Structures are given as structure tokens and as C-alpha cells.
Amino acid sequence: NIKWKKLDYFEPYYFFVPKDFKANEEYEKGFKIDDVFSVSNSGAKTDRDSLFIDMDKNTLEGRALRLLSGDYDEKFKQKYRVINSGSYKLSKKLKNRIFDHNFIQPIQYRLFDYRWIYYDPNLISRPGQKVFKHIVSKENLALLTCRQQSTFDFQHVFLTKILVDICTVSMQTKETGYAFPLFLYFKDGSRATNLNMEIVAEIEKIVGKVSPEDIFDYIYAVLHSPNYRN
């Protein structure tokens, strides 16, 4: 007695529920966000937020000093989980590491929630250096969004000038936050745009000469547009 319904599908979408693809042709005329920006990465993940992140800079500094000096007791070890778990071998990472004040950096932990992180890429689980080496102590902007959505209507867009956590945009497990920096920095201190210049050229054919900031602002505005979101 089951009434079957044949589903329409095409690459790269293979939904197992009915979908309305009427607007898909118009939607596909746009550019994919990870095609517009050449370099991107998920936000930083420490695996030990209570150890490496704090609201107070001085408190974090004291805790990091204690951790890296090895001058801590069993209570400290249990409270801050100074233990190995899964593939994250903290004890191994701590070997031969010394405290460096330059690793204390501001982080946008959640939306409008700014904290401090001891950002030693050799210590935390997933530092996201691919992106954050272009942001930490640099003049830059990064677009924040999620690659997939598992909850309510699309509103997963923000921006940052500093480090972000993997859950800055959303705390849902499936909604990992990604950062797309506007500029890439080189060892000599120079920088270049992180935008795909072929796509920039296509845009300039329509609107004329634009700056990287113009395109960044436009993308951010469109992603906030009610018409686009609907």
C-alpha cells in the first residue's frame, strides 16, 4: 500500500527527499565560496578549551606558565585534562615546549564572545595554520560560514579580524565553522589577495574595476540578504 514517488536528482546532489529545483539554474550561476577564496580552513580546535582558553588574559598566562613548566599537581592535571585522549597526545606535544608570551592571542570564541587563547600551533589539536598564519598579528579580514547546515534557516555568516574557534558560528556538530581570509601574507611581509583572479575578472567584466575589499563586502552583504537566503 506504499505510494512510491520517483525523486529527481542530479550531480552533485543526491537527496533522498523531494526537493524543488526550480531555482537551481539561477542559483548555479553564482560562484561557490570555496572557489572565490583560494585558501580556507576550519576554525581552531584545542581539544582542551578549559586549559588553553580563558576570559582573563592574566589567568590564562598563569595557567600556561604552570603547564609548560611542569609545575602542576594531580588536581591541576585532572581539572584541565592534561592527559592523552584518542589521537591527541598532549603529553608528547608538551615535551620541549616552553612558554612564549606571543602565543597569547585574542580569539572570537563564539559570536560576540571574545576571549584569550594560548595559541601554540604545536600544542593544540587543530591549529588551522593554513589560514591563521595569515590572520594572527596581521591586518586582515576573514569571512566565516559553515559548509553544511543541520538546523534552522541559513544565517551562518559572520566575519573576523582575529582567531576563531571551530564552533564560533555554530555549536552544532555538523556545522563546523570555516574561515576564508581576504589576504595571504608572505615571509617578507608582503601580501596578496586570496581571491580567485579568474572570478574577479568575470565580475569586473560586469561592474568594472573593483578592489578585494569591494568583493568581500559584496559577498558579505549578499549572504545577509533576505532575498538570497529565501
Annotate each PLM feature.
Residues 1-230:
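Sequence-level detector for compositionally biased, low-complexity segments
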